[in-house]
Amino acid sequence: MKLRLSALALGTTLLVGCASSGTDQQGRSDPLEGFNRTMYNFNFNVLDPYIVRPVAVAWRDYVPQPARNGLSNFTGNLEEPAVMVNYFLQGDPYQGMVHFTRFFLNTILGMGGFIDVAGMANPKLQRTEPHRFGSTLGHYGVGYGPYVQLPFYGSFTLRDDGGDMADSLYPVLSWLTWPMSVGKWTLEGIETRAQLLDSDGLLRQSSDPYIMVREAYFQR
């Protein structure tokens, strides 16, 4: 289980709120809203409170913060080559080289990426939200495709989530076995969910949490 079913959408929701009314709606569609609401109720009202959230609580309470930071740095470092490629594909060689530098320094000097040496050495090399292949497709005007809520996964569109699968074709991600990839996704999902535990009430208090999560997904 990828365990990002609530973390990704909820995290973005807390950052951007419901300020979607003035955003560009081009390429967004929700033709399966009835099905999606059913899957949302399962993911957020059954799976999250009974499985995902308890795991996140245990992770926050019993795993030391330095260990959590190191694991987060390590999994993020694995994505740096793919982020570099996507920036080059988007015609931004400067940012591509930034992420090459991050990967090189953190892998060589940061114990394989457990320590963010690059970010500590230079503010311009701070860790940022990764640009994945879905972002590259969006850069060239490819639409999202239908919005879908998938069981055990959460928000999904063919462009952003399906397109992101292309990133697994680049090293280092291409070197991971399927169990390794599942482990990486699980760690990332648990950590993100743990960071949001104190903000659960904001989503629960929404008059329509499904719409809030859907719009937050498109505002990432």
What name fits each language-model region?
Residues 31-65:
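Post-signal-peptide N-terminal segment of Sec-exported extracytoplasmic proteins
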Residues 71-74:
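Beta-rich strand-turn-strand
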